[in-house]
Amino acid sequence: MLDTRYQDLRGQAESAIEADLAPTPPKLEVRGLSKSFATQDGSMTVLEDINLQLFAREFVCLVGSSGCGKSTLLNIVAGLANPSSGSVLVDGRAVTGPGSDRGMVFQHYTLYPWLTVSQNIAFGLQLRKMPKAEQRERIDYYLNVVGLTQFAKSYPKQLSGGMKQRVAIARALANEPAVLLMDEPFGALDAQTKEQMQQFLLELWEQTHVTVLMITHDVEEAIFLSQRVYVMSARPGRMKLEVLVGLPEHRNLDMKLSPEFVEVKRQVLHSLRE
């Protein structure tokens, strides 16, 4: 009897060790993805054999020249477009269309002008028919997270560009997605506001632990925000280089002047120019 119990305990211990040693599955995975569009001359390949993985709580940026297919890739991940071949998986489940497991923040302001800040944040929650009390609690929480509690009843026309994007981020996060997708969210902002928003986003990411995939033309922005940077080739877009940033998780804007930051920037720029 004692021997049997020992064997059971040993088996449980071995199973626990195997579970600890098992590789962590990716939160988001893109497998062999390609995308082509029909043209008068036949077809045009925009993306070719894209493969990437994001793990839980990672912040990853994609950089590449205009027209390389970055936005097309993000739209496919969001479920707003279909790939010609390959697949996208979130938590191991195939993406077949838009879903609450992915939040999206666009470059251009996408707030509903007839809704207040609170109502904009609540929009997705109402579509999901979330109970009113839970909606109120979540709205209040994310208003506080993005520092806009005092603007809850304001309309988009009363907000600055940076504040509008904070609301857009809060609206996306309120649905508590597995992955937050960002398509050049600060591209329309002036340089000073852009840097302020970069610091804000980094602090927000540290607070919420959300997994982020962001595309940007700004190499410094990509390095400052992310743990890894993917460099895409010109059309057809392929993954040219993956750079591990290797900077401390807690960062400030002065870090952009550090030798470590400059070295990563050199690698990324060299790859973009090749």
Protein language model annotation of sequence segments:
Residues 63-65:
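The feature captures the beta-strand-to-loop junction immediately N-terminal to the Walker
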Residues 86-98:
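Conserved ABC transporter NBD signature motif
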Residues 115-123:
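Short coil-to-helix segment of the ABC ATPase nucleotide-binding domain corresponding to the Q-loop/switch region
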Residues 122, 126, 133-150, 203:
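Conserved ABC ATPase "signature" region
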Residues 154-157, 175:
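Conserved signature/switch motifs of ABC ATPase nucleotide-binding domains
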Residues 169:
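Hydrophobic anchor residue at the start of the ABC signature
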Residues 180-183:
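Catalytic Walker B motif of ABC-type/P-loop ATPase nucleotide-binding domains
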